[in-house]
């Protein structure tokens, strides 16, 4: 099986690395060559660390990197068996990508989206192969996180679901079957909890460090909600909350004003060096 991953950012590169380590030939595509090069260089750096720590041999690393190629040409999807989209979490962007892929890819090619909250059914409507469109939601950092949410759209076929479930297992993941709903399972439960932590901070209930300490030692969480939001990216948290609020129309999903304020200030968490904590 040949796989294309669209997007060489953190999630895309993680998917590329995981697929290549599982033995698949992978091509990563992004809109600029510098993005592609940066993504592949990041994979190389992470694998080098694994070699240094004795987790893999130099020969194994070379074999993995040999299965990875990069391009800016969307036409490279023509001979792929699966395309996994890991682009921006914006519906119009995803629909445009899937419409283009539908015109390029061979009829039997499966088109998967790594969307964290958007409708697979709506994305699939941009194509003429809705039965072969599916959600394949990985979690960051992809090489380490075992879960993949496999999301059925309204028209996703059983054959498509079975193929992606089997692939997820071959990639060393534990797939869970999701019938499409806003936020799926993890983000529907997780992101509102993070959002509530932000309300606690905004309302002066406790400071950021104490909020996180409370959830780590009081609820057994490995990471506090505000540090976790910083790791996910506050812009991503905001988009997910906006999606939940829009789809459900329930005030409990209203994004915290402090979250929106921080995103406007480009304080997005770890990736910008500052969020609820400094990095």
Swiss-Prot record:
Its main location: cytoplasm. Pathway: Lipid metabolism; butanoate metabolism. It catalyses: 3-hydroxybutanoyl-CoA + NAD(+) = acetoacetyl-CoA + NADH + H(+); a (3S)-3-hydroxyacyl-CoA + NAD(+) = a 3-oxoacyl-CoA + NADH + H(+). Disulfide bonds: none annotated. GO terms for cellular component: cytoplasm. Keywords: Cytoplasm, Fatty acid metabolism, Lipid metabolism, NAD, Oxidoreductase. Belongs to the 3-hydroxyacyl-CoA dehydrogenase family. This is 3-hydroxybutyryl-CoA dehydrogenase. It comes from Syntrophomonas wolfei subsp. wolfei (strain DSM 2245B / Goettingen).
């Amino acid at each position: 099986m040949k796989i294309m991953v669209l997007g060489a950012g953190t999630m895309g590169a993680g998917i590329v690395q995981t697929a290549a380590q599982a033995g698949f030939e992978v091509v990563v595509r992004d809109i600029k060559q510098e993005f592609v090069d940066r993504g592949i260089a990041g994979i190389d750096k992470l694998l080098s660390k694994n070699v240094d720590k004795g987790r893999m041999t130099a020969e194994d690393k070379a074999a993995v990197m040999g299965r990875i190629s990069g391009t800016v040409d969307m036409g490279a999807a023509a001979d792929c068996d699966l395309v996994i989209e890991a682009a921006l979490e914006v519906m119009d962007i995803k629909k445009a990508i899937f419409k283009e892929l539908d015109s390029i890819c061979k009829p039997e090619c499966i088109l998967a989206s790594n969307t964290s909250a958007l409708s697979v059914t709506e994305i699939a409507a941009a194509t003429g192969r809705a039965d072969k469109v599916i959600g394949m939601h990985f979690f960051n950092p992809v090489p380490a996180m075992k879960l993949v949410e496999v999301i059925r759209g309204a028209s996703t076929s059983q054959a498509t679901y079975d193929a992606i479930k089997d692939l997820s297992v071959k990639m060393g993941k534990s797939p869970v079957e999701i019938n499409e709903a806003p936020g799926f399972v993890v983000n529907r439960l997780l992101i509102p909890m993070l959002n509530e932590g932000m309300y606690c901070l905004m309302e002066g209930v406790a400071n950021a460090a104490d909020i996180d300490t409370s959830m780590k030692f009081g609820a057994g969480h490995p990471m506090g909600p505000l540090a976790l939001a910083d790791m996910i990216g506050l812009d991503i948290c905001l988009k997910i909350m906006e999606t939940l609020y829009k789809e459900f129309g329930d005030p409990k999903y209203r994004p915290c004003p402090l979250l929106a304020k921080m995103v406007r200030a480009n304080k997005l968490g770890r990736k910008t060096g500052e969020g609820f904590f400094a990095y």
